[in-house]
Amino acid sequence: MSKNSVKDKAKSATANKTIALNKRARHEYHIEERFEAGLALQGWEVKSIRAGRGNIIDAYAYVKQGEIFLIGAQITPLIQASTHVVANDRRERKLLLHRSEIDKLVGKVERDGYTIVPTAMYWSKNKIKLEVALAKGKQTHDKRDAAKDRDWAIEKQRVMRRGNRDA
């Protein structure tokens, strides 16, 4: 086995770890802090996620009786899923976090007007993990400013490339 094939395998292994991304979260929220949380899933949900049927774009988390639950995440059941289990693709799922992390999130959400938003779903040691972020909503003008900054960064790169070609 050559060195290149080992590098290619490593790259493909890291690329396969991401199940779903929530790009909308970065656009609509100021992300303050990120946490890694486990998910309490049923067997058919894990099978569906392995088949690439997970979606977290419209999802958010909320606090209920000192625990944090994910709602709005869609895990579409497989066609060959078992019929004796009623598959609800948008059911609320419990997030598994340490008590200190839960307390920190609860304090910020209840007092400071933050929200808990999932940003990514990925594999970690054969377990499905969810990256949740403590975030504050952006105003419309904040979104426009972010778009301007992004456009300016792209334009700067173009100018720099043109300048390097001429030299």
Curated annotation (Swiss-Prot):
What biological process terms from GO does the record include?
trans-translation
Q: Name one GO cellular component term.
A: cytosol
Keywords, in A-Z order: Cytoplasm, RNA-binding
Coiled-coil residues: none
Xref: InterPro entries: SmpB (IPR023620), SsrA-bd_prot (IPR000037), SsrA-bd_prot_CS (IPR020081)
Q: Which domain of life is it from?
A: Bacteria
| Location relative to the cell | Cytoplasm
The family note in this entry says: Belongs to the SmpB family.
HAMAP family the UniProt entry points to: SmpB (MF_00023)
The free-text function statement in the UniProt record for this protein reads: Required for rescue of stalled ribosomes mediated by trans-translation. Binds to transfer-messenger RNA (tmRNA), required for stable association of tmRNA with ribosomes. tmRNA and SmpB together mimic tRNA shape, replacing the anticodon stem-loop with SmpB. tmRNA is encoded by the ssrA gene; the 2 termini fold to resemble tRNA(Ala) and it encodes a 'tag peptide', a short internal open reading frame. During trans-translation Ala-aminoacylated tmRNA acts like a tRNA, entering the A-site of stalled ribosomes, displacing the stalled mRNA.
Q: What is the name of this protein?
A: SsrA-binding protein
Gene this chain is encoded by? smpB
